């Protein structure tokens, strides 16, 4: 399902500028980092694809969905997200994809059928953090949270198993995870 950008409300104070961008892994594979973020020009955000939201000041997004969007959490089907290898002459630039949590709910990373590390934006430190299922790391994606993957050659899709959907933030080692409680707010967020 998709959300049109025009239907996303922002609580604005004064006049601010904002933009939604997608990540172009093919551009990175060809030319390295620096020009990989592209403006969303079609006015539609697609479930499963990651985006960055940037604003000239802190704003709060309200995304309204229809009943079909709400039923996505209840469907027994897994979600299959296509990814691109993006072959490059440099291994560090190859295979990068920005994936969005395809469910409108919290999601435990252990439900992803993908064994390479995932990289998430840490809005508190303005850095990226890496997590690995193989290293028994724990991470819970918030609704509308995006993350980077560097896909190995031969990988065409990433599967999200429905059993790891969560109605609220999860307990990890007996504590509420702060990342899963994060709001989609601020000047820069991956969604």
Language-model segments: which ranges?
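Cationic, amphipathic, low-complexity alpha-helical segments enriched
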Residues: 172, 177-191
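N-terminal exported-region signature
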Residues: 1-165
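Short amphipathic alpha-helical linker/capping segments at the junctions of internal repeats
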Residues: 163-173
């Amino acid at each position: 399902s998709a959300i049109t950008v025009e239907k996303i409300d922002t609580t604005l104070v004064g006049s601010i500028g904002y933009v939604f961008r997608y990540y172009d892994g093919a551009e990175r594979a060809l030319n390295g980092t620096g020009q990989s973020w592209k403006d969303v020009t079609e006015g539609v955000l697609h479930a499963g694809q990651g985006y960055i939201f940037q604003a000239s000041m802190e704003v709060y997004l309200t995304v309204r969905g229809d009943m079909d969007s709400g039923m996505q959490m209840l469907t027994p089907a897994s979600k299959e997200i296509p990814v691109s290898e993006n072959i490059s002459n440099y291994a560090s630039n190859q295979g990068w994809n920005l994936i969005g949590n395809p469910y409108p709910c919290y999601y435990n990373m252990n439900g992803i059928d993908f064994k390479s590390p995932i990289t998430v934006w840490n809005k508190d430190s303005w850095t990226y953090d890496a997590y690995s299922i193989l290293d028994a790391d724990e991470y819970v994606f918030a609704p509308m949270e995006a993350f980077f993957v560097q896909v190995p050659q031969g990988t065409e899709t990433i599967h999200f198993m429905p059993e790891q959907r969560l109605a609220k933030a999860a307990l990890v080692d007996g504590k509420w995870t702060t990342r899963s409680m994060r709001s989609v707010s601020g000047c820069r967020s991956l969604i």
